[in-house]
Amino acid sequence: MGRIPRVWYGNAYSRSGGLTDYNRFRSYSDVIGPMPAASVADPHFFWLGPTSNYEVRSAWYGDAQGTDPNFEAPSKWRQNIGLDIITKKGYDFTVEYNKDETSEGVFYKDLGLTQTGSLADGRGTYSGAGDFWLTNTNKGQAEAITFIMKKAFGDVQFMTAYTNMNSDDVYPLTSAQAESAYGYTQRWDGENLNASRSSFMVEHKFLATLDYTRQIIGNNDTRFSLVFVRKAGEPYSVSFDEPGYNSVTGNSRFYADYSLAYIPTGATDPNVVFASSDVANAVMAHVNSTGLSAYKGSHAPRNAFNSPWYSRLDLRITQDIGVFDDHKFIVYLDLLNLLNMIDDEKGIVREYSYNNSRQIMVSGVSDSGQFLISGVDPDDNLWIQNNDGQSAWNINFGFKYQF
């Protein structure tokens, strides 16, 4: 796999504990004045120096981050095998299988993590210092198998393919900072993390292309190209919607709303206390009508579910216009996401933000460790994703000169 983002190494230097005078000084602080040459009371730079007159952060902020001296850059063992077959009738088949096994993966530990007790479902309660340690894990794997078929039918070129993928990892690692990479990870019990379905895998993907070329205007090629894609949605987790900034475990280093939800067995489940009978009925109706029912009395693993499937159809029309010799203009028209152009309810990507859905609402835990369930939000955090225009139709027109 090779390199990792350098900022992951940089955390140990920028957050080394009391060596740094600067620690997120805020403009509301009446103790710390502006740094030299700073025009505001909340400077966004680091000021280092053992002779500094500025206040060093208190012990509460004295977390320190480090890197395991035996840390190895991520690596995997990779195997693949492929088979190509061309039949007498012109069918071109390809089958390819890939298998990855993690040799050295990335793992974050809080060296100050301490278990303080247990909750009703068996998960621990914790306190943490935020002394994050960059180290390795050998957990994780990925495998994929792809089938491809190609065939020419006169002026028509046809291709279809299918890929099935299964990929597991420990941390999604979507953040540059150790604390957020650690905190924004769905978990059941502290750092007892197993490899789970990756947030980035596409379990099923179908692809089909159709290409038709005909000389409609003189000896100039007119080409129609269709591309159809249908794929499974991203994996996501079902978590508690937690109050405040702490998880139900009591540890602020595990970010709120990222605790995997306990799934009640029914209205009389001894591990939970429902706010009312109406809340109990609503929660259990949701559980019994979804895949959560398979996990009653426990929790659904990280990324156990999938967002809705997505389909897309694109069309490109190109027209050659000969000029002289081998010189020609190529005019093209792209109709992107035709399904959405025809029906604005089609061709839409719906995903759970950060692969997380806070469906079971809790107000806290009881003195005996029961979860205080206050409600249910069946489609929490489900959004239409359109940052790159993937949920909207598009028309592009252009030309190029080829010689």
Spans of model-derived segments:
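Hydrophobic, lipid-facing positions within transmembrane beta-strands of outer-membrane proteins
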Residues: T67, W77-I81, E143-F147, H204-L210, ...
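Membrane-embedded beta-strand positions of outer-membrane beta-barrel proteins
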Residues: M1, L83, F93-V95, M149, ...
